[in-house]
Swiss-Prot record:
Signal peptide stretch: 1-23
Keywords: Disulfide bond, Signal
Compositional bias (Low complexity): 136-175
Species of the source: Dictyostelium discoideum
Name by which UniProt lists this protein: Lysozyme C-like protein DDB_G0288143
Superkingdom of source: Eukaryota
SUPFAM superfamilies associated with the record: Lysozyme-like
Family: Belongs to the glycosyl hydrolase 22 family.
Source lineage: Eukaryota, Amoebozoa, Evosea, Eumycetozoa, Dictyostelia
Region (Disordered): 133-187
Disulfide cysteine pairs (residue numbers): C50-C125, C74-C82, C78-C97
Active site (UniProt): E55
Length: 187
């Protein structure tokens, strides 16, 4: 095979792979919502979405994963599915363990709920999905700019970002998961 044919084949294969990977784009809200609906009763979906949203990034915590679970849970509540804290890095096992924590402690298993961040009706992801459907917010294009804000629940959320470099800024209460921002492990 000639080098030019090999390069053409690689180029076509790469373009095909890129088009397939761009065919389905899920927001972090979609990913979290899918996990929540798989493991939790539908009556608590909003609360668990809020807990995941607020617990995913907590720079002051040594807890693990989307649900910010304590490593001790592997020896107690989650011992049937978890052998070590490393297991909690698996998002599905982390969510299964979160379900067990909820069954054992209820919402009191999470500081974000105890601090009042998730006690009121919370529909941030529903709002983001509505904005996307109506064209007011685009998270599917890598070259788009976006800006959104929410302050009705007192969390002071606001963010803005643009471009393919992932640059942007957010302001508001620290320690909150900001959909679309890097660093939360859901991109």
């Amino acid at each position: 095979m000639k080098v030019s044919n090999l390069i053409s084949t690689i180029t076509i294969a790469s373009a095909l792979c890129l088009s397939l990977t761009n065919a389905l784009v899920f927001s972090p809200c979609d990913k979290i919502q899918s996990l929540v609906k798989e493991y939790f009763d539908e009556t608590i979906v909003d609360e668990m979405m809020c807990i995941a949203y607020n617990e995913a990034i907590n720079p002051k915590s040594d807890s693990i994963g989307l649900w910010n679970l304590k490593k001790e849970h592997c020896n107690t509540v989650c011992k049937s599915i978890c052998n070590s804290e490393i297991d909690l890095a698996d998002i599905k096992l982390n969510t299964q363990c979160a379900e067990m924590v909820y069954l054992e402690f209820g919402f009191n298993g999470w500081d974000s709920y105890n601090n009042g961040l998730c006690k009121d009706s919370w529909g941030f992801c529903n709002t983001q999905n509505e904005l996307r459907q109506h064209g007011s917010h685009s998270s599917t294009s890598r070259d788009s700019s976006s800006s959104s804000s929410r302050d009705s629940t007192g969390t002071g959320y606001s963010s803005s970002g643009s471009g393919t470099s992932g640059s942007g800024s957010n302001s508001g209460q620290t320690g909150h998961f900001i959909p679309g921002q890097s660093g939360h492990g859901l991109n």
